[in-house]
Amino acid sequence: MDVFYPLKSTVAKFNECFPAILFIVLSAVAGIVLPLLLFLRSKRRSSVGLPPGKLGYPFIGESLLFLKALRSNTVEQFLDERVKNFGNVFKTSLIGHPTVVLCGPAGNRLILANEEKLVQMSWPKSSMKLMGEKSITAKRGEGHMIIRSALQGFFSPGALQKYIGQMSKTIENHINEKWKGNDQVSVVALVGDLVFDISACLFFNINEKHERERLFELLEIIAVGVLAVPVDLPGFAYHRALQARSKLNAILSGLIEKRKMDLSSGLATSNQDLLSVFLTFKDDRGNPCSDEEILDNFSGLLHGSYDTTVSAMACVFKLLSSNPECYEKVVQEQLGILSNKLEGDEITWKDVKSMKYTWQVVQETLRLYPSIFGSFRQAITDIHYNGYIIPKGWKLLWTPYTTHPKEMYFSEPEKFLPSRFDQEGKLVAPYTFLPFGGGQRSCPGWEFSKMEILLSVHHFVKTFSTFTPVDPAEIIARDSLCPLPSNGFSVKLFPRSYSLHTGNQVKKI
């Protein structure tokens, strides 16, 4: 009799799981049949007027080749091969959708300058549940512009000047606590900690370590779920992400309610951080943002500002380690700023604006390794472009990889040459350099990211005389959508042999 217990257990588990199994089977069938019908329909449609190219295999199109190119750092080759065969406008099929890729500045302009005219942002509903259906990413038209106006109350250059001291102190404390005193560190790990600390401090004024760590843990789970298979069942990444989003909402809701009380009682000011700015914002009609809009936008901002900034900052340090002459120019620029300060003087907006060469280094890093791969749009009408028709409902893709590494737009594009961005020289042609996107949906927080990278480099130079990579041959890889040094980029640190301050005057060394 005992020998049948395993069988009974298996049957019981099957009966218990049957609804879930049935759901998966039906979803699989639908996932096969519906794309097949769409694929056959697209094949039957007259090809006259459509851009040249190939849709690949049924169901998967060229998605696997595309993802392989992302993970193997061969995106440029993936695109170049198709441009060579079909030209600067070609069709393919990516992530289950017929897609037209537009290459070059003219194609970039068509997509980025025609939001809500010819194209609109398009994300899967499953992703929007995690990113926020009332976030700036999901909003369109007037709703998008209202949220953008709210964000500009914090992210505009004029507003950011108020937060330089707070950001600078957060960075200085982080370097003193987690970098200084260590002979060797992992740059990617510590930069990740730093970027999240800055966001937690300036977005919510959260200073407690355990609260920051809990937020970070939830955001990591959500980030994995955004592009996961959208199955809301135990054991699936998407299910875990939905649960994490619910917990994140509970934490943020508590912060919102407390801040409302603090604002009412005078314990908080209207501009002390992004949360206060959001809560006190009113549109042209005098309407405030709803709590749901604030929740959704904070979730999206925390995720969006983290990955891209960590990528950019880590790659800046990696490229400076490989180009000592450029690093020396950065050092001299930063020490020049310090030489004009007395001990205890804070960094000012004028100081940040004077970090011209350091900013050129960041720009050149983003040209070589853009933090965003590009983005998809959906055609909201038939689009006539370069003699072709892009049908309504098709996806369009723009990517900086069609201009950033090209000789026709940047001389010697394979070289790390920060001076190419010297604004006193030749200006970069429009729609060729797009590290922050463009048009209505350009990154609203790019000035914030610029400031935190420049201030981080400043405090690093102030603390360390130099650094050397443990593995100079380590590459920058795009294993995820954001490029990062492949093994965390461990470096040996060499602190300055004595303080930059002698008496009250900063000493240049």
Swiss-Prot record:
It is an enzyme of class 1 (oxidoreductase). One of its GO terms (molecular function) is iron ion binding. Pathway: Alkaloid biosynthesis; taxol biosynthesis. Belongs to the cytochrome P450 family. It is found in: Microsome membrane. Catalyzes the conversion of 5-alpha-acetoxy-10beta-ol to 5-alpha-acetoxy-10beta,14beta-dihydroxy taxadiene. Also acts on taxa-4(20),11-dien-5-alpha-yl acetate. The chain crosses the membrane at residues 20-40, 186-206, 218-238. Optimum pH is 7.5. Gene3D superfamilies: Cytochrome P450. It is a multi-pass membrane protein. PROSITE patterns: CYTOCHROME_P450. It comes from the Eukaryota. This is Taxoid 14-beta-hydroxylase. One of its GO terms (biological process) is sterol metabolic process. GO terms for cellular component: endoplasmic reticulum; intracellular membrane-bounded organelle; membrane. Its main location: membrane.
